Amino acid sequence: MPFFVAAAEREIVGYVIARAAADEGEILNLAVAPQFRRRGVGSGLGRAILELLGSRGVTAVYLEVRASNAVARALYEQLGFREVGRRANYYRRPVEDAILLRAAIPAVRASAKL
């Protein structure tokens, strides 16, 4: 499974892990330590994993995010993801819907160069 780790002064501050099958990829988890959020770590990790997946022939990437996680949803939108569905009661503790997002790799590459 492809992944990237972000570090600052020898401390892990974030990571992203994904998987790919044929021409589709899925981001399984992207996390950044609270004190390093809103500093570009998450967007850097997201761009890196999308570029890697694209280099492996992936043309579309999917992920799920909690409906209430506005910060993560904004990050994913910046990376080129768009809502394509909803999974009712997907998460537990608390029970909550997941928003299914999709990004086309060519669109991501174009927006990342701006």
Language-model segment annotations:
Residues 33, 37, 66-68, 93:
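Residue-level recognition of the GNAT/N-acetyltransferase active site
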Residues 76, 81, 101:
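Conserved active-site tyrosine of GNAT-family acetyltransferases
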Residues 20-22, 67, 95:
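A short coil/beta-turn micro-motif at the C-terminal edge
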Residues 1-39, 46-56, 85, 104-114:
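Acetyl-CoA-dependent GNAT
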Residues 62-64, 82-99:
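Conserved catalytic-core motifs of GNAT/GCN5-like acyltransferases
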Residues 46, 68-72, 89-94:
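Short glycine/proline-centered loop/turn elements that form peptide/ligand docking sites
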